[in-house]
């Protein structure tokens, strides 16, 4: 299996690294993707690392990069490599790919680099699923989403996708958010203790 963090922040990459299943770097490892990631995949990550400031055209905030003018070219090259690596995996792997997204939480609505309107995590994951199945029909994958924002989602609702998407999308509700990484470990990563 190949595990690919797709946001919202660096917690997923930290979790995978801590449990020795983060074997390579990907575009969303150490940044904040306020408005989801599906548009990046849809556009083959075009202009992903072109910076006018610390947030790109996809509303991805680069918290750790693009701070020092002396190394900006190095940061651009690093993200270009990560994007190319991800696209190559999507095009060529025979392994199952597990995309993991920790959904946004209430504070993301008011962070200074965030947008007033944050993408609906479920809709973005559905859009990503449609992109993946059309662009990479041979790809075996699962998208795992943990909902976290109590302003956008209710603890009283069980969120599911359409029946034809359920094989590829796994949504964990807001009431399970505190146990999201334990769920990932128990369901998708074997022999790991949290």
Q: For each predicted feature, which ranges?
A:
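Extracellular glycan-modifying ectodomains
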Residues: 1-194
């Amino acid at each position: 299996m190949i595990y690919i963090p797709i946001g919202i922040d660096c917690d997923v990459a930290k979790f995978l690294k801590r449990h020795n299943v983060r074997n390579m770097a990907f575009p969303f490892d150490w940044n904040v993707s306020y408005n989801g990631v599906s548009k990046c995949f849809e556009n083959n990550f075009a202009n992903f690392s072109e910076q006018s400031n610390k947030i790109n055209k996809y509303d991805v905030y680069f918290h750790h990069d693009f701070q020092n003018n002396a190394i900006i070219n190095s940061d651009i090259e690093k993200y270009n490599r990560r994007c190319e690596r991800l696209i190559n995996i999507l095009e060529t792997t025979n392994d199952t790919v597990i995309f993991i997204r920790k959904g946004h939480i209430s504070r993301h609505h008011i962070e200074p680099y965030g947008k007033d309107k944050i993408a609906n995590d479920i809709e973005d994951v559905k859009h990503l699923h449609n992109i993946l199945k059309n662009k990479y029909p041979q790809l075996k994958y699962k998208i795992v989403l943990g909902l976290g924002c109590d302003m956008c989602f209710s603890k009283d609702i069980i969120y599911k996708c359409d029946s034809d998407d359920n094989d590829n999308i796994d949504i964990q509700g807001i009431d399970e958010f505190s146990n999201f990484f334990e769920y990932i470990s128990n369901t998708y990563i074997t022999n790991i203790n949290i």
